[in-house]
Amino acid sequence: MKDTAARLPSIVLRVVLGWVFLAAGWSKIGQTMPTLATIYSYQIVIPDLLAEFIAMVLPWVELLLAVLLFAGLFFPWTLLATAAVLAAFTALTAQAWWRELDIDCGCFDFGAIHAALAVLSTPGGATVRNLVLLSLVGLLWWLWARRRVL
């Protein structure tokens, strides 16, 4: 019982992050063209073939990370991959925010959830949200490392 109580914060953080990645990936499944349009809306210079590849693979990467987070499998590697994906998303949304691009981040389909959450789809809102999620990954890493030392 004591071991479960000690692990509860890590479990909660894994589930929260897992749900975020599940929602993001699920909303993009079968939406390759809208995802591709979102990638182009960031106005970054990448080859068309790479943009198309990202649009096709990204939902599956997000879903895989969700499953790994839920299951707690390959934990340090899953956290590193999650941090890398979030860092890339943060860099993209931050540059769009800095350049004052009036775009939807393409992270989720907030319209299906509630219009009040639309602010989280703006580049500024998405950047702040991603920084919060990155801090949760950092906290999860710290909890994992601390538990391994103890």
Sequence positions of predicted segments:
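Short, surface-exposed linear patches
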Residues: 43, 52, 62, 91-93, ...
